[in-house]
UniProtKB/Swiss-Prot annotation:
Record-linked InterPro entries: HisE (IPR008179), PRib-ATP_PPHydrolase-like (IPR021130)
Gene of this entry: hisE
Protein name: Phosphoribosyl-ATP pyrophosphatase
EC number per UniProt: 3.6.1.31
Single Gene Ontology MF annotation: ATP binding
Amino acid sequence: MPQQTIEELYEQALERKQNPQTGSYTDYLYQKGLDKILKKVGEESTEVILGAKNNNEELIYETSDLLFHLMVLLVEKGVSLDDIKDELGSRLGKKSLLHERADWRGDKKNEKDS
């Protein structure tokens, strides 16, 4: 089965933005603008959550939809995959302070340790 990388998906979204094709779904999203794209990202995010509750096949399908819509969003906003990779790289090796957050531990906001 052929595979497509995230980079190829991004490049496809960028190509459609630069060279619209009448009747394509991607072109439709770009024509409708940011609000429509954001709505679709929100819908697809919810569908990923629901898919994860059901089965892996549905999770894979819905995640693919979400990734597509995220690529369209990134292109629309002028954010490159290199921008995302740089951000991810800046997080490498950083210690998470999540264990220190009272809200994560379930502590009440004004409750002091005994």
